Swiss-Prot record:
Native organism: Staphylothermus marinus (strain ATCC 43588 / DSM 3639 / JCM 9404 / F1)
InterPro entries: Cren7_sf, dsDNA-bd_Cren7
Family: Belongs to the Cren7 family.
Pfam families assigned to the protein according to its UniProt record, in alphabetical order: Cren7 (PF11520)
Listed HAMAP family: Chromatin_Cren7
The protein, known as: Chromatin protein Cren7
Domain of life of the source: Archaea
Keyword Cytoplasm recorded: yes
Subcellular location: Chromosome; Cytoplasm
GO molecular function: double-stranded DNA binding
GO cellular component: chromosome; cytoplasm
Function noted in UniProt: A chromatin protein, binds double-stranded DNA without sequence specificity. Constrains negative DNA supercoils.
Keyword DNA-binding: yes
Post-translational modification: Methylated at multiple sites, to varying extents.
Gene: creN7
Length: 62
């Protein structure tokens, strides 16, 4: 799987909106539905990891 390289605007755990590159992106979809893409991000201030929704046109990577 290729590494993620495009930045996405997300809200961090502290509530700030920043542009981050996800560590990994995967698809969550229940049977028979479209689903959403979720990314794993690391907060630059605290170093903690969190998940956030990414746009549907973002490639699956990680």
């Amino acid at each position: 799987m290729a590494a993620c390289k495009d930045a996405v605007k997300v809200k961090t755990l502290s509530g700030k909106e920043v542009e981050l590159v996800p560590k990994k992106v995967w698809q969550l979809s229940p049977k028979g539905r479209k689903g959403v893409k979720v990314g794993l991000f690391q907060d630059p201030e605290t170093g903690k990891y969190f998940r956030a929704k990414v746009p549907d046109d973002y490639p699956i990577c990680g």
